[in-house]
Amino acid sequence: RKEGDSVNRTILHSDCNCFYASVELLHHPELRGKPVAVGGAPEARHGIVLTADYTAKRYGVKTGMALWQAKQVCPDITFLPPRMDLYLRFSRMAQEIYADYTDKREPYGIDESWLDVTDSATLKGDGFHIAQEISSRMKKELGITVSVGVSFNKIFAKLGSDYKKPDAITTMYEDEFQRKAWCLPVSDLLYVGNATNKKLYSMGIRTIGDLAKSDETLLVRKLGKMGSILWAFANGYDESPVKLENTLAPVKSVGNSTTTPRDMETDEDVKIVLYILAESVAARLRENGFRCRTVEINVRDKELFHFSKQVKLQNASNITKEIAEAGYRLYKDNYRLPADDKELKSSRPEFFQKPLRSIGIRGTDLVTDYFWEQLDMFMDPQAREKQMKMDETVDIIRKRFGFYSVQRGLMYRDIILSACDAKSDHTVHPHGYFG
């Protein structure tokens, strides 16, 4: 870095504490002080903990834990179903508060944001004072608490917000980050996941300070380019700007996946679920003015074996049938019964040896609706136009009368597997840090 480039910046990272659970407790005050988690219905096998409140966390309940596991470690826990529309509304209200201090705001998921308040000091005060104001307003106006990190770059601002929770403000200024951050486990640094942590551990690197003092060349040899990036982060060399909200990286793919209420045991089961998911993917592509040129599926069986496969489409598409059929062909071509299990095949030829537990489908390699390409000479343009108009009509009907107002006949073959509105249930995931 050039000396002084990032020293003069003031970056905040604001993290809403136990966000989903905190919002729910505003609507369920009778549950305050009791263990609460937000997740899917416990009777549905795919339910996991999305957020737990601090009372539940003290019992050992963690984000990502299966609901049945959470119930084991905390028998008195109360599960609440997620309400994404409600959380998104609170997220937007939080952004409105942040907007009073800067236009340089970069959301990191639904409950976190970086703020560059460098230019706000004259009117609003220094970074610590702004963090205090934001913390106070979030409590008074939204009823939730935040942890805020104040630093000279994004990496240490994020580390500061993680440093102490809940309802805390932590500074990580240039003259103090070595004292505060270098003693922390290296896994606390952004982008040090489990696999990277194991590699660093094998190199004798336990803390952020160990990483900072390591040989950068050796790190690159072991971790590739990421080794150099992490070494720079540990030493405070991060000049990445806080992106304006409307300049974040464009959508690169649109997908949906699900763990079904019961195992998928036949080809028809898989086809039903793929069509449900493809309807959501295609509808969201149309809403955003995109078509996909590649379809990818992800499949996991009951023993958690999984594979991913993709195929290039003849023509870019946002048509449900084309996306679903491409995904179904990928599944048929790549999921096979073991050849040696003749007895099982003869007794139950229509069943898999290992039923499927979850499946996902994704449209990638996106182009805009006005992207021009030569249509395949063997394709029937009138039939394709008919499919497009049918999809658009279904969009209109569902928008007015609800998802279940019009359904494909295929869905009525299994009401358990088809009881899913994948588009409405879709969760928006965080933007990648590197764009």
Where does each model-flagged region fall?
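Gly/Gly-Pro- and Ser/Thr-rich, intrinsically disordered tail segments characteristic of DNA damage-repair
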Residues: R1-N235, V242-E245, A283, P381-G435
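Acidic, metal-coordinating catalytic segment for phosphate/diphosphate chemistry
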Residues: N315-G435
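Short, charged/polar surface micro-motifs in flexible loops or helix N-caps
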Residues: F19, P42-R45, K302-F305, L366-D369
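DNA-contacting surface of Y-family translesion DNA polymerases
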Residues: H13, D188, T196-Q353
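A short glycine-rich, hydrophobically flanked beta-strand micro-motif that places a catalytic Asp/Glu
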Residues: V146, V150, R293-E296, I359
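A residue-level signal for beta-strand positions that form part of recognition/binding surfaces
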Residues: I11, P35, D76, V251, ...
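Short, hydrophobic beta-strand segments
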Residues: S113-D119, S308-V311, T368, E373-M379
